[in-house]
């Protein structure tokens, strides 16, 4: 049957652009016009659309800004139709350490991925989630929602998946990642290696060529 002949190939990321390297956080923050005092960095990157769940991240940030003594800054890279609504929610929640960065070029995203301590993807729906894979390629663990394509490449060795509407679970998973993020550099190395060995664009191209060869033979 046709169903038995279907082959699903995951997207690959560009390993020439996204790879692990130490980044000077103070210099990065200076280029963003933000002060840096050694805070832990929570990062989101993506379109500011309803299905991306950035409103969930803002409410979760409100929790960890109030509930923990750990200094945490939340950076939101991207733009979209929800920007004004999210800015209003940001003001309503009184978030003091959460910042909208607007759209960022790929080289700036690379710096952000390498500087951050955890990447958060609270999507309500997510076909695949390439930005999460790019973050992992830089060694960044992911806390994401158990939706769409994210479970295809995120497991407990490289991150945490929770229900998209469980803000308590998101907050707990983020704080758990931050508790160990700077004490275990080998974790970042493992995350980057996992991404490179399983999802690099070069592997995707090779697999696709193999598929075409098998069809044409």
Locations of regions flagged by a protein language model:
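Aromatic "clamp/platform" in nucleotide-sugar-dependent glycosyltransferases that forms part
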Residues: 124
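Carbohydrate-associated surface elements
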Residues: 12
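Short hydrophobic beta-strand element within catalytic cores of glycosyltransferases
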Residues: 141-144
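A short, well-ordered alpha-helix in the C-terminal region of glycosyltransferases
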Residues: 183-198, 210
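Nucleotide-activated donor-binding/catalytic signature segment of Leloir-type glycosyltransferases, i.e.
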Residues: 87-104
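Conserved acidic donor-binding segment of nucleotide-sugar-dependent glycosyltransferases
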Residues: 156, 160-167, 176-182
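Short alpha-helical donor nucleotide-sugar binding micro-motif in glycosyltransferases
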Residues: 103-104, 111-116
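Conserved donor-binding/catalytic core segment of Leloir-type glycosyltransferases
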Residues: 36-52, 58-61
């Amino acid at each position: 049957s046709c169903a038995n002949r279907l082959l699903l190939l995951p997207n690959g990321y560009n390993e020439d652009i996204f790879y692990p390297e130490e980044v000077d956080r103070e210099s990065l923050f200076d280029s963003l016009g933000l002060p840096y005092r050694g805070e832990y960095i929570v990062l989101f990157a993506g379109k500011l659309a309803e299905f991306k769940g950035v409103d969930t991240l803002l409410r979760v940030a409100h929790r960890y800004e109030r509930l923990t003594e750990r200094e945490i800054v939340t950076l939101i890279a991207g733009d979209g139709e929800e920007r004004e609504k999210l800015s209003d929610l940001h003001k309503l929640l009184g978030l003091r350490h959460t910042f909208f960065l607007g759209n960022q070029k790929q080289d700036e995203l690379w710096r952000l991925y390498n500087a951050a301590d955890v990447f958060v993807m609270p999507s309500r729906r997510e076909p695949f989630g390439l930005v999460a894979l790019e973050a992992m390629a830089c060694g960044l663990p992911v806390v994401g929602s158990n939706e769409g394509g994210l479970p295809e490449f995120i497991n407990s060795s490289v991150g945490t998946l929770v229900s998209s509407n469980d803000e308590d679970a998101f907050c707990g998973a983020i704080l758990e990642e931050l508790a160990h993020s700077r004490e275990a550099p080998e974790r970042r190395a493992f995350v980057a290696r996992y991404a490179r060995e399983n999802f690099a664009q070069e592997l995707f191209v090779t697999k696709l060529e193999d598929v075409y060869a098998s069809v044409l033979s």
